Amino acid sequence: MKYGNMKKWAPLILFLFSLLLLQGISLHASSPSFSVNASYLASLPYANSHVAVVYYQGSLYIIGGDSHSNQVWIYSNGTWNIGPSLPFSLVSPSAIVYNNTIYVMGGYNSTGINPYVLKLNGNSWVVVSEMPLPAYSPYIFVYNNAIYVIGGENTTSPAGLYFPPSNAIRLFYPNNDSWRIIGYMPVPTYGGGYVFNGTSLIIVSGYIGYSAYTNDILIYSPQNNNWTILNGVLPYWIHDSALAYYRGVLFIVGGYIYTAGSGGVNNAILAYYNGNLQRVGYLPVPVYSAGYVQVGNMLYLAGGIGSSLSDVSALQLITFNFPPLPPKITSYSAGNESVTLGWNPVRLSSGYEIIYWNNMGFNSSINVGNVTSYTVTGLKDGITYYFEVLAYNSIGYSSPSSIIALTPASVPNPPQLVSVKYGNDNVTLNWLPPTFSGGYLLLGYYVIVKNENSMVSSHFVNSTSLTISNLTPNVTYNVFIYAVNKLGNSSPLVLTVVPITKASVFAFITKLGNGILVNWTTSFPANITLELYNPNGNLISQIAAIKGNSSYLFRVPQGNYTLVIIASNSAGVSKYVYQVVYYLPPASPQVSLIGFGNNLYISWNNEANVITYLVYVNNSLVYEGPSNSIVTNISNGTYLVKVIGVNPAGSSSPGIAVIHYTGDYVTVVKMKVVNVTIVSKIASAVSGNGNNLSLGQSIVIILLAVMILLSIAIITRNRSNGFDW
C-alpha cells in the first residue's frame, strides 16, 4: 500500500490555496570560486519517495518510504543489498547516526503517526522510547550527546493539513532514552529543506499552515536555544527540497516550487552565500520529497517524486567542488643553503605550490606536486627567506598558509631530546646536539624553565645534560632548550615536565579471621615492597615489587607483628613502619565447679587466642593467669563464679556457674551442689568438649570418688546408730 499518495498531492492542493498570497522576490549575485556536478549514480531497487537516508559504516541506508515501507536497502560499492526490515511500515521517517548506530524517529503508516524511536541493534531494530508530540518528517540532528527532533507534521488527515504543523523542540537523550521539550519554533514549519552544519540548524522554506508557505530561512543555535530568521531570502516558496552546507555556502537542491501563478518540480541546484542566491547547476532527474544525506562535499539524493508526480528510482549524486583550504605548515628547518618545509595534507587538493622571497628583491615559486614536504635548495646562507604554501585543484588555489621566516646557516636547528629522568623535586634532561649547527660552532645551550607564563629559572650550559632542582611536585613546567651559535639561538626544543617526589604511603590495616589485610595508596607512582616481622624481629614474609595501588593478605596466626611498607620510585625510597596487634576478641569460657571438703574446684575449657584468665568468686578476683583450673577455700554458702578470657583485643563475656555449699571437709552429707552433679556430672563436664583431662581435673575426680565412698560409709554407720538423714 502506498501511504505517501496523500503527501504527493498535498503540495499541489496547498499551492492552489496559496497563489493569492505569494509575492515575488528577485536576487542577483556573482558566483564564488566553486563548481557543482550532478550525476545519476544508480537506480533504486524500485521507485520510492519519502524515505530516510543515512551514511553508516561506509554505506548508504535507504529506510522506509512510500513503497515497501518497512524495507531497508543498503547501497555499497555500486551494489544494493537488503538490510534489516523495520518492525512496521514507515513513510516520511527521519533518521540519524549517533554513537555508531542508527536511530529512526517519526514517520507514519496506515495506523497513524509513529510515536516510537527505533534503534539498530546488530541486525535488527528495537523500540527504545516514544516521542512526545509525535510528528513525521521532523528536522533531526545530533548536538552535545543529544538528538534534537524539531517540528514535523502532526496529522495525517487531509483536512488537518490546513492547520500549522508542530513547532516543538524535543531533545532525546540516548544514554537513558529520555525526552525533554526545551522550547518551540518561532514559525512552525514542515517539509522545509534542512541541514545541520555542526553549529547551527538551517531550515529553508516549508509549509507553515493555513495554506501558506514561507520563503524565509530559519537558523537555530542549539548552544543557546535561539532562532534567527532571514526574511524573504527566496524568490519563491519551495517544499521538500534537499539541503547541503559546505565551505560557508548553502545549497538548495530540487523541491516543489510555488511562484506567482504557477508551480512545479524544481530541477535547479541553488547556492546561497554572502546574502545572495544563484542557480549553480541542475539535477539529472528533477525531484522533491527525496531522501538525502550529505557526506563531506557530496550530497546523495534517493528517490523522490518526479515531474509527473510519481515516485522515481534515481539515486543521484551532487558534488560541490571548491578550491582546497589553505595548508598548515607543521615543520620547518634551515639547512646549509636550503630550507625544508612540511605541511598537513589538504582535502580536495591535487597539488601544492611554495612561494618564497627575501627582502633583497628576490622572489620565486615552485610547483612541488602532490607531496606534503619539500626542500628548497640554492639559497644563500645568512639571508632570511620567507615561505608560504598554497594548495590547488582544478577549481583554483587556496589562500596561502601562514608565512614562515627562515635563514639558512643563520642559527642551529633545535636540539633533540634523549631522555627525561625525574628525581626528588628535580628533573634531569639529556639531549643531542642539533642536526645542523647553522654553519658555525655551537657555543652552548640556553635552558629556560617556565611555570605557565612566569619565568622560574634560566641556565646556560656547555654540555647536553642538566639537572633542574627545587621544583614543586605535581606542578607543570614548560622547558625550552635552545642551541646557540654566534648568530643566535635555534628555535626551541619544547617539553613539558611534571616533577615528582618520594611517594607517601597511606595504609589501611584490617584484622580478619584468616589474617591481616593491608590496603594502601601512594601519593606518586611507586614500586611497593611489604615486609612482616615477628616480635623477635625476624622477617617472616616479604612481598616485593608491587606496582600501583593494591592490597595484600598476610595469612598468619594471631599475635604481635611489625609491618614495613617500602615505596620506591625515581625520586627515592620511603619507608613506613606499623605495629600490628593482631588478635580477635576471645569467646566466653565454659565453667565447671566442684565443692568438696571446704574447697571449691573451678575448671574451664581453653579458648583460642586467650592469653590470661580472670576468675572471680562472688565478684572478688581469686585468680589471674594462663591456667584452666584452680582450687579455692570456701565455707557454707552460695558462690557465683565468673571466668573471663583476656587478650590484647579485649575480654570475653564471662563464663558463669553457681554452687550452693553446706558442710565441711569431714561432714559432706549435707553438701549441695548447684549446676554440677556428683560423679556423672563431673565426667560430662570434663569430657563433653572433647579435650583431654588436665592434671588438676584428674585429681579432683580422684578426690571426689574417695569422698563418695567415704560418704556411703558414714551414711551406713549413722543409720545403724539411729541418726536421722
Curated annotation (Swiss-Prot):
<feature type="repeat" description="Kelch 6">
    <location>
        <begin position="299"/>
        <end position="342"/>
    </location>
</feature>
<feature type="repeat" description="Kelch 4">
    <location>
        <begin position="201"/>
        <end position="248"/>
    </location>
</feature>
<feature type="repeat" description="Kelch 3">
    <location>
        <begin position="146"/>
        <end position="199"/>
    </location>
</feature>
<dbReference type="InterPro" id="IPR006652">
    <property type="entry name" value="Kelch_1"/>
</dbReference>
<dbReference type="InterPro" id="IPR036116">
    <property type="entry name" value="FN3_sf"/>
</dbReference>
<feature type="domain" description="Fibronectin type-III 4">
    <location>
        <begin position="585"/>
        <end position="665"/>
    </location>
</feature>
<dbReference type="Pfam" id="PF01344">
    <property type="entry name" value="Kelch_1"/>
</dbReference>
<feature type="repeat" description="Kelch 1">
    <location>
        <begin position="59"/>
        <end position="100"/>
    </location>
</feature>
<keyword id="KW-0732">Signal</keyword>
<dbReference type="InterPro" id="IPR050964">
    <property type="entry name" value="Striated_Muscle_Regulatory"/>
</dbReference>
<feature type="domain" description="Fibronectin type-III 2">
    <location>
        <begin position="411"/>
        <end position="504"/>
    </location>
</feature>
<feature type="domain" description="Fibronectin type-III 3">
    <location>
        <begin position="505"/>
        <end position="583"/>
    </location>
</feature>
<dbReference type="InterPro" id="IPR013783">
    <property type="entry name" value="Ig-like_fold"/>
</dbReference>
<dbReference type="Pfam" id="PF00041">
    <property type="entry name" value="fn3"/>
</dbReference>
<feature type="signal peptide">
    <location>
        <begin position="1"/>
        <end position="28"/>
    </location>
</feature>
<feature type="domain" description="Fibronectin type-III 1">
    <location>
        <begin position="323"/>
        <end position="410"/>
    </location>
</feature>
<protein>
    <recommendedName>
        <fullName>Kelch domain-containing protein SSO1033</fullName>
    </recommendedName>
</protein>
<keyword id="KW-0677">Repeat</keyword>
<feature type="repeat" description="Kelch 2">
    <location>
        <begin position="101"/>
        <end position="145"/>
    </location>
</feature>
<dbReference type="InterPro" id="IPR015915">
    <property type="entry name" value="Kelch-typ_b-propeller"/>
</dbReference>
<feature type="repeat" description="Kelch 5">
    <location>
        <begin position="250"/>
        <end position="297"/>
    </location>
</feature>
<dbReference type="InterPro" id="IPR003961">
    <property type="entry name" value="FN3_dom"/>
</dbReference>
<keyword id="KW-0880">Kelch repeat</keyword>
